[in-house]
Amino acid sequence: MLRKAISVFTLPVCMVVASCHKAPSATPLAVRSPDGRTEIVAGRLKSGGLAVRIRHDGRDVIAPSEVGLMPDGEAYGPVEIEGSQQITTANGGEASHGELLVKARERIGGKRALLLRLRAYDQGAAFRLELPPEPREGNIRLAAETSALRFPRDYACLAVRHAKYLNSHEGDYAPVRTSALQGSALYDLPLSCATGRGEETIAITESGVENYPGAYLVKGQSLGVALRLTPLPAADHLASILPRRQGLRTGWRTVLIADRPEQMIASTLVHDLAAPSRIAHAGWIKPGKASWGWWAGVKTSGVPDAGFNNPTYRHYIDFAARFGLPYFVIDWGWAARPNGDKSLADVTRFRPGVDIPALSRYAAARGVRLWLWTNWDAVGRDMDHVFALYERWGIAGIKVDYVYRQDQIAISYYHRLLAAAARHHLMVNIHGAPVPRGLERTYPNLMTEEGVMGAEYNKWSRSATAGHNVRLAYSRAIVGPMDYTPGGFRNTTPAAFKVRHTLPQVMTTRAQQLAMFVVYPSPLQSLADAPSAYVDAAGHLAPGSDFLRLVPASWDETHGVAGEWGRWIAVARRSGKRWFVGIMGDEQRRIVTIPFDFLGSGRWQMRAWVDGGKPTDTAGHWGTIREGTKLRVPLAPSGGAVMILDPA
């Protein structure tokens, strides 16, 4: 039941004028996190607009900010807050939180209703706007969402800039002050920012987007950002069209909050805000590592005439079986392609020299299953027909590529894709797509997503630097699974690095490539390099390959252990009783101190792989660790380290 609001606090219109007077005292509509540290507050600006404010430890991380919608081309005018309803925290595995539903209505004109739903978690806060269903025909034609997020000071952020809506969502999370954001640019999610109050860090993103477009951020009117919805492809002036009887819900406008920047990578907030699983029986979904032939250029020693053919694919399958990998990803090139056009690939037929059912049987006999690359448009023409065929072939999963969109139609496509794939017991990896919005909770068969400037950029650029790799751990990696495809073993220095498309190099040490398997979350981890990079013809393992055989792809517990924002990071993840630690550094040589407070009581046997004398070398160390131990670890330029800890 809605309770009548006795009074409504008024928020200053600081986003419009340079100075403002203190708001009059009143009773706000607010909800706190279970630990009491985070509070999200609803109220009205002096202009009458609906607003939110987010506070952490009693101080603003998001200053009073107007939120709203523009349905049918008309923005909401001044509103009255009619009441609110406290929502009991849901059960069923959802993280504990406080929730408040606020009901507002326009004072004049159409007196349209507008709902504002607030949530506060220990890891941050979120809000979403809702238009209630109407008992009449017709559509809601949404022109824009007018929400903004104002900052109380000039934050230092990591941001990816795009020039247009249609893009691969790949780029460098470059350092930028909010005051220096470009007015004409679209900024991708997440926007990760140091607030300037100690080591406190926040990140702005979204979750739970359905029947609604994905959002970008743009420079706000003052310090801060505003939301910019991706328009429908055939109507630049429209963001969404929905039946009035259905109503409308925005995505959750999400703010992650952490006391220290490295703690952000352990956040589950984006996942927790998404809708619960819609797959009733998910026992067939199996995380794991995969061999993969595309990055090296389908070139490997030991295979005459290596290329898009059965002998080459069998070689990768044999390697996966010997190396203990449950999967082999067959990337583009296997399907029949009329006129050689990838977008016209017939993903139900294979090219001459390739026999997918035979390869699937060959792999199954060796304990390996296949993933198949598909073009998003080709597979979208008749999903159930294509996926039923793949199920008969024994395929484990699909890699869907070249979407490049996050408009309302594309968001609905992702939901349809994952639901159809689940009906046919197929796991999914989405490429050329936006960053995660929590869909892996709603559809657990979504194993990983791209939306990252990953290892492939070594094939044609100098962009995948160690500094970029570290910044990913403080930005893109904090919102969900990330298919960076680590494991490049032709390691060299930035000065010696040469761009080449076949058998590419990487400008990090071997140990940094190993650390990515711990630092970057991805329940499907594809080993980028050719089999010959990991094991030579005599069966000898390359330095670090022994670690790759041991590291899992899924985790039971995660801690951001230590770091310096954008410069280096240490992450600990637990699988069963075993802990793995990954450390990554930028181009600077340094010695870092790693605390082991995350360990339980007792003694732990440690094995470590650290930077060796050359980029391709690792040095091994063994020892005994206790809870509370601190280790000093040297990092070479563009370096890293990994550790495995077992109960003694």
Question: Where are the model-predicted features located?
Answer:
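Bacterial N-terminal signal peptides that target proteins for export
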Residues: 1-10
